[in-house]
């Protein structure tokens, strides 16, 4: 057997360099390749390390960094390999002279050189966050050394559980009528009471009006379930009074909706979470309010009022800019200092108040962050993001609690992640979309986020490029601290997208093992279905869950979710490690999460595929690989340093390498 095999015979190169992924030099932002003491601050030194497998005949490695707007270069020194390592380390030191320092590596080889598997080696190539490229490239995919204040350390280990409050759990505090529909003392005009087992509408006006009566005390009742999944952070969609059940059209930010139990219920929930060592992430719309919001009503009533400057009126009082021309969602004008004092800036703002007692939220998810502060020639998005980050920092100084700032973003967010504003995003573009494109039911007619087409079915080779390409444009901390979600309250359900239990298990394995914060939308763990974002907001069938009723609950998905998220908690590499791609085929993806304490290999298969033979040739002492988890129809066999990964159907295997 040769030293390195990379899949079935005749597999074409899967990288622009022409070098098989497993034989390529490697660097990433993880702790095995970037070393420094504590949080990196301006002026600190970082040790940068490049791993070159024994299969790759390198001649020299040099650093190219951009410091103070000018290029800095240095030759990397080879350091002795540790016993059992099958490759070479090259190292240098880089000073964080600027808040963000971009860098890459020039990798030279002798003309005509080949790898151990016989692949031609480029004599001249750049190693960037996008991989090995045998020509000159722009700086957009350079690695980045970031010296801004980091995200809270707890985010590295977090698993988020997303709850749409009205559909999660209804406590005994909510009165119901004889037909089981909620019957509060004061029912808003918009609300259409629904029995818990009635199916939500797929689309249409009714979607925002169906009121099931879930409340915050109901969430407290179900914390055991959330904790059993391995989740430690609860993300609530908006809790403020509004003109709809989704509450993204708030009528005030000063109190919690009485339909959910009011301020006292949110304080009770926060306290219950903190008693368990769990955390609370709240949801805020900074781009718009509802048309019934007290600020907007004051603005319409008096064009000379302070509140009139909070909005973008075109013809007062009824002509105004709104989110995507939805009249019920008037857009905020964040050029207004008075608005920012009330909404985003300082301890008295909406952002600041809910971080303090009695709520003590552990962070904010900002709705429509990509449009916040942007309209025509106005763009104050970065100012607002930095300002909110500053409000979180002030709260930390007051309370001692570190808080997380996450931005909703549906496409390429790299331009908004400089490192000093949002800690990360909801990673639809760099995680959800490519995973859907790979795992979607080939016959699916679903679309999402307004795309005027049905979902394509792409090969793993293309999907790996997408995952790597989007990731390459983000600073590593932003990538690690972004939310990875397979579905959310704004999309069809995972199960409806992929079509089968078997492919959903592969999706859960990807969620638990790729870099980023796993975020599970309540109901996905039981195989819930939904054809649109509105239809996906299905009430949780708690009686069926308790009875393990297989007609309503996919117990295999539930068990796999618990096992895989539990494994993530056990393996530090899956939480904090770097990412090294080893192989991509049409129906399989293979990568290693690298960490000084351990390396963990993950193989995902969407369908049956010929055996893939891999010698990872990773750094660290060679040890006997240990299979940590298997789901579906995947097998792994060990023959010395070579792994044989095969699949007769969809599945995944997780292997500890060292």
Where do the PLM segments sit?
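Short, surface-exposed loop motifs enriched in S/T, G, D/E and P with embedded aromatic residues
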Residues: 69-84, 92
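Exposed beta-strand face motif in extracellular beta-rich ectodomains
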Residues: 99-103
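Conserved aromatic beta-strand anchor motif in extracellular beta-sandwich/beta-rich domains
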Residues: 63-67
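Active-site and adjacent substrate-binding regions of carbohydrate-active enzymes
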Residues: 2-30, 37, 46, 50, ...
């Amino acid at each position: 057997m040769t030293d390195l095999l990379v899949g079935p015979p005749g597999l074409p190169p899967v990288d622009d360099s022409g070098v098989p992924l497993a034989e390529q030099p490697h660097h990433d932002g993880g702790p095995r390749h970037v070393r420094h003491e504590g949080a990196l601050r301006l002026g600190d030194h970082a040790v940068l390390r490049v791993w070159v497998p024994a299969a790759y005949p390198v001649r020299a490695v040099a650093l190219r960094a951009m410091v103070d707007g000018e290029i800095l270069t240095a030759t990397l020194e080879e350091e002795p390999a540790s016993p059992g390592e099958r490759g070479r380390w090259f190292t240098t030191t880089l000073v964080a002279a600027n808040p963000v320092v971009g860098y890459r590596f020039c990798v030279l080889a002798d003309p005509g050189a080949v790898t151990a598997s016989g692949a031609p080696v480029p004599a001249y190539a750049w190693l960037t966050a996008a991989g090995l490229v045998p020509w000159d490239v722009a700086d957009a995919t350079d690695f980045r050394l970031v010296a801004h204040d980091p995200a809270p350390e707890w985010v590295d280990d977090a698993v988020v559980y997303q709850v749409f409050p009205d559909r999660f759990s209804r406590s005994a505090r909510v009165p119901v009528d004889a037909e089981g529909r909620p019957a509060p003392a004061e029912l808003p005009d918009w609300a259409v009471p629904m029995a818990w087992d009635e199916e939500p509408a797929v689309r249409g006006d009714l979607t925002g009006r169906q009121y099931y009566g879930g409340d915050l005390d109901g969430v407290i009742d179900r914390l055991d379930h959330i904790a059993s999944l391995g989740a430690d952070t609860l993300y609530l969609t908006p809790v403020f009074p509004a003109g709809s059940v989704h509450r993204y059209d708030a009528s005030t930010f000063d109190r919690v909706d009485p339909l959910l139990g009011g301020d006292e219920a949110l304080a009770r929930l926060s306290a219950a979470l903190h008693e368990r060592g769990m955390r609370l992430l709240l949801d805020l719309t900074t781009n718009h309010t509802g048309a019934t919001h007290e600020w907007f009503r004051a603005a319409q009533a008096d064009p000379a009022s302070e509140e009139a400057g909070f909005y973008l009126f075109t013809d007062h009082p009824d002509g105004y800019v709104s989110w995507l021309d939805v009249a019920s969602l008037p857009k905020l004008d964040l050029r207004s200092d008075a608005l920012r004092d009330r909404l985003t800036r300082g301890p008295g703002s909406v952002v600041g108040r809910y971080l303090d007692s009695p709520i003590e939220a552990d962070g904010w998810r900002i709705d429509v962050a990509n449009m916040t502060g942007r309209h025509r020639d106005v763009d104050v998005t970065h100012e607002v993001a930095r300002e909110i980050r500053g409000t979180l920092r002030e709260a930390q100084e007051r309370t001692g609690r570190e808080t997380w700032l996450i931005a909703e973003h549906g496409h390429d967010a790299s331009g908004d992640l400089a490192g000093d504003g949002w800690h990360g995003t909801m990673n639809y573009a760099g995680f959800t979309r490519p995973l859907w494109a790979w795992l979607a039911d080939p016959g699916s007619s679903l679309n999402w986020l307004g795309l005027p087409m049905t979902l394509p079915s792409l090969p793993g080779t293309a999907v790996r490029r997408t995952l790597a390409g989007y990731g390459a444009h983000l600073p590593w901390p932003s990538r690690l601290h972004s939310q990875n979600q397979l579905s959310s309250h704004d999309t069809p359900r995972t199960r409806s997208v992929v079509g089968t239990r078997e492919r959903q298990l592969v999706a859960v394995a990807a969620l638990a093992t790729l870099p980023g914060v796993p975020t599970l939308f309540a109901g996905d763990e039981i195989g819930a279905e939904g054809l649109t974002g509105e239809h996906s907001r299905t009430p949780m069938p708690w009686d069926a869950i308790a009875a393990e009723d297989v007609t309503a609950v996919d117990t295999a998905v539930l068990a796999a979710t618990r096992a895989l998220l539990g494994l993530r908690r056990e393996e530090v590499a899956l939480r904090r490690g770097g990412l090294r791609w080893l192989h991509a085929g049409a129906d399989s993806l293979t990568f290693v999460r690298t960490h000084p304490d351990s390396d963990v290999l993950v193989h995902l298969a969407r369908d049956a595929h010929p055996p893939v033979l891999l010698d990872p040739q990773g750094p660290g002492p060679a040890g006997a690989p240990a299979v940590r988890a298997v789901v579906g129809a995947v097998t792994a066999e060990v023959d010395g340093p070579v792994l044989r990964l095969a699949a007769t159907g969809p599945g995944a295997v997780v292997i500890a390498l060292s």
